[in-house]
């Protein structure tokens, strides 16, 4: 299994790190924008020799071609949307990550770069687009269509046929 790069150095990246590790992924490191502040918890992870912090200007494809977007979506989806487009064009494999503590119907379809956190429940005939966050404890009932670049926030409930 190739190591995974986490693009982002904030709180959401910390949450992504934990799920990736719990699901057995090896982490290549975190990638930060040149002007991005680094979450203090990431500095703690960086004290481990196998976890590094890279700059977006590094030759990242030499490190790994697998990636997740570790920036959240608090105010707008534009930063995630733009990063997804850039990484896709650069040839990165934006992997889907599904916590083993989530409950996902086998009749669910997923786009690329989907991240499903712990205790999420996704029922039958749900379609989830590219670059989506299905956050901790959220529920998506039957026959829902979650478009590209959506964030179903912590504890959200989306009833059927939405």
Question: What is each residue range found by the language model?
Answer:
Residues 11-12, 75-78, 109, 128:
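Short alpha-helical
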Residues 23, 84-87, 132, 150:
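Glycine-rich, phosphate-binding/catalytic loops in enzymes
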Residues 11, 35, 74-75, 121:
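Short, glycine/serine-rich, charged loops/turns that create anion-binding
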Residues 1-48, 54-61:
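Hydrophobic, well-ordered beta-alpha structural blocks that scaffold small-molecule cofactor pockets
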